[in-house]
């Protein structure tokens, strides 16, 4: 377990991703460095009204403290009171073009230490894609990149983390997946630190290859008010998921995290309307019937 | 304790409020009646793209069941497994004009029964106002109507329920009140059923007088893109409160309530932007400095 090594990787990952996205967009991200009064801090990189990205944030944070609050360890009461350290990179990008999907990626590391005891640590992370208008080839490309990221660690990871992603990014109050999925994992600490770190690093390292080709392909497709309107409506689901179900968002907001960094994930313009659904057979209906179905995008086995 | 009497009152209240609002707006509400598979149902009255109201809903629901789930009674474990019955009217109105405030009102009744035991019951409710551009006279008018509603039940209620409202409608992650407050109460079952019912009824009955004069005064004020933009930004706070902190919304969504009726409270068009605050001294800044301060709008005592 080497925390400094993980932190260095995360700082570098954030820089590489922001630089890569700036090359695509042509507009620079704003960079805000902030301190956490209780220990640690972070850097939030934000783009708004870019050429391609309507709103997006790539956030790095590294927080630590002396006594882990009981609320943070409900599932592991034996960790209460331990010193802790957590670091991660988290991003959400909302392109302007309704044919380009929203994307989310996160890699994170947590460690709880106590003198005279073995440190307890785990990795978590993943990435998932949320289209407004679905393209089968985009979904396949994204899942292939997820699989490529995990394959070096072992055959078993992609199917397991793909399923975990479908289960996690699910709006129970809508009985609806958030998007076409990807991969998600948490509590990863087996078989050893090096294997877990390599796997997590590979997920972060594959992000640009997973997303940028899709963004490039869709960024300049012509669209009109109808598509923008549907995008704004569907973005409401993103808000609902993040504020009602996402554990990271809720924990951050309820535990005094930096609100503006946490809510960078929310879309720039959102609409709600009552009991609306798209006309059967329309391109909008196709999103529900063909894409928000938890299907397998890659041939299994 | 007479449940039928409460239910009749609530059905009538919904009708009176919807009729009153239709007279103001000139457009009819859509009325949807729905059943709850586990027992009960409701009527949702919705307006969208009205002449004055951009989006609004007035919801009546009456639900019952045989065994109260433990999750619903965390604070009162002795009620688990009892038969229960709950009814309420809940409304949120989002006017189009940014000078007209958003308003919320709710009155509700809950009863848990068991053969051979005294029924356990309580009332809850209140109303609160959320301006985008504040007007002192509107805040005073609204609070005066709240006080008028409670005064017949006793001097002590308005100050107590005003404070409770300020505490409840508070965005902890923003350190910011949702609006200029009003009144809020819950668990009301003293001194007796008749007193509690009268008080709750008076709150419901005062809603139109509390809000309609404000709406009429502001509905036709001239505004431009700047004011609409600030309104959309501030509406984001409404979404954040309702999805992150509001117990009724969260419980409804997480317990299989009717999603479209619960989320009628969300605004039609919402914007999020990073780390934004209004220029010092601007009309937008005045909202924060002069109105979102938990102040007393009526002379005390």
Curated annotation (Swiss-Prot), chains A, B:
Residues flagged as site, Important for dimerization = 173
Name a GO CC annotation attached to this entry. Answer: cytoplasm
Name of the protein:
Oxygen-dependent coproporphyrinogen-III oxidase
NCBIfam families in UniProt: PRK05330.1 (NF003727)
Tell me the Pfam families matching this sequence: Coprogen_oxidas
Residues holding a divalent metal cation: 94, 104, 143, 173
Q: Which domain of life is it from?
A: Bacteria
Where in the cell? Cytoplasm
Upper lineage ranks?
Bacteria, Pseudomonadati, Pseudomonadota, Betaproteobacteria, Nitrosomonadales
Q: Name the InterPro entries on file.
A: Coprogen_oxidase_aer, Coprogen_oxidase_aer_sf, Coprogen_oxidase_CS
Which residues of this protein are catalytic? 104
Keyword set includes Electron transport: no
Could you tell me the Gene Ontology terms of the biological process aspect for this record? protoporphyrinogen IX biosynthetic process
Give the residue ranges for region: Important for dimerization.
238-273
The Swiss-Prot or TrEMBL record lists the needed cofactor(s) as: a divalent metal cation
Q: Which residues bind substrate?
A: 90, 106-108, 256-258
What family does this belong to? Belongs to the aerobic coproporphyrinogen-III oxidase family.
